[in-house]
């Protein structure tokens, strides 16, 4: 039977990268929102109402995406730490 080896430092770095990507998405979203704010003032009437509906959907989707990425990052980090602790406990049973 072969052994499965985990690279815990790399796994933790990956979780950190994921958290960074969530921050990047949030930052890009803020940049886009500032550009859209300039455009929104020019849209009035039915066009403005339609735009506001789309903008609300966009904002919610971005918030959901950032929150999901943050959640995935936290879950990945938590699971990695749990696996590391379990490996340590199992190794201790064998004197390693």
Swiss-Prot record:
Gene3D superfamilies named in the record: ESAT-6-like (1.10.287.1060)
Pfam families: WXG100
Superkingdom of the source species: Bacteria
Coiled-coil ranges from the UniProt annotation: none
Cellular compartments per GO CC: extracellular region; protein-containing complex
This protein's UniProt keywords: Secreted
Location relative to the cell: Secreted
Stated family: Belongs to the WXG100 family. ESAT-6 subfamily.
Subunit structure: Forms a tight complex with EsxS. Exists in heterodimeric and heterotetrameric forms.
Domains (record comment): In the heterotetrameric form, EsxS adopts a long helical conformation that pairs with a second EsxS monomer in an antiparallel manner that allows the N- and C-termini of two EsxS subunits to interact with an EsxR subunit at each end of the EsxS dimer thus creating a molecule with four-helix bundles at its extremities.
NCBIfam families: WXG100_ESAT6
Protein name: ESAT-6-like protein EsxR
Record organism: Mycobacterium tuberculosis (strain ATCC 25618 / H37Rv)
Gene: esxR
């Amino acid at each position: 039977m072969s052994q499965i080896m985990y690279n815990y430092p790399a796994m933790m770095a990956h979780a950190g990268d994921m958290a960074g990507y969530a921050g990047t998405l949030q930052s890009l979203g803020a940049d886009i929102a500032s550009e859209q704010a300039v455009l929104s003032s020019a849209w009035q009437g039915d066009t403005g109402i339609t735009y506001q509906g789309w903008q609300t959907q966009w904002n919610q989707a971005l918030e959901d995406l950032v929150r999901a990425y943050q959640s995935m990052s936290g879950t990945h980090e938590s699971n990695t730490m749990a696996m590391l602790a379990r490996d340590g406990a199992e190794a201790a049973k064998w004197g390693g």
